[in-house]
From Swiss-Prot:
GO terms for molecular function: rRNA binding; structural constituent of ribosome. This is Large ribosomal subunit protein bL9. Binds to the 23S rRNA. HAMAP family: Ribosomal_bL9 (MF_00503).
Length: 150
């Protein structure tokens, strides 16, 4: 199925690109999340009329994400978990825990925006974590996991 992208989609294209994707991906993800529309002649004509408006909205989202990223970049977040004597945690620190800790400091993030490349954190110490605020804005945050003896 051919679709017109209404915003930048990672590994697919930019705003206004007409791309061919699998039907299920278009019907179940791109179209319901308003990231794309079917590429019919009328849809293409309507898109060209609204193109400047959509580009302006995308630029505003990017500027807001960059401003938020400047505040968030290099931030140190401290999370306390129960741990054993050897520094291993009972349980783990997940992206939801990190998003919740950042929300406590006044940053609104979804847990899907926190990227843990090696999975949940299972050791006490400082761990670098990436936070994707926008497809083009990724900042680094240091998560300090402090062990609480049982």
């Amino acid at each position: 199925m051919q679709v017109i992208l209404l915003e930048k989609v990672i590994n697919l294209g930019n705003l206004g690109d007409i791309v061919k994707v699998k039907d299920g991906y278009a019907r179940n993800f791109l179209i319901p999340s308003k990231k794309a529309r079917r590429a019919t002649q009328t849809a293409i004509a309507e898109f060209e009329v609204k193109r400047a408006e959509l580009e302006k909205a995308a630029a505003e989202k990017l500027a807001a994400a960059q401003a938020e990223g400047e505040k968030l970049n290099g931030l140190n977040v401290q999370i306390t978990q129960k741990s054993g004597v050897d520094g291993r945690l009972f349980g783990s620190v997940t992206n939801a825990d990190i998003a919740e800790a950042l929300a406590g400091q006044g940053y609104k993030l979804e847990k899907s925006q926190v990227r843990l490349p090696n999975g949940p954190l299972k050791m006490v110490g400082d761990h670098p974590v990436s936070v994707a605020l926008h497809t083009d804005v990724v900042v680094d945050v240091t998560v300090s996991v402090v062990g609480e003896s049982v």
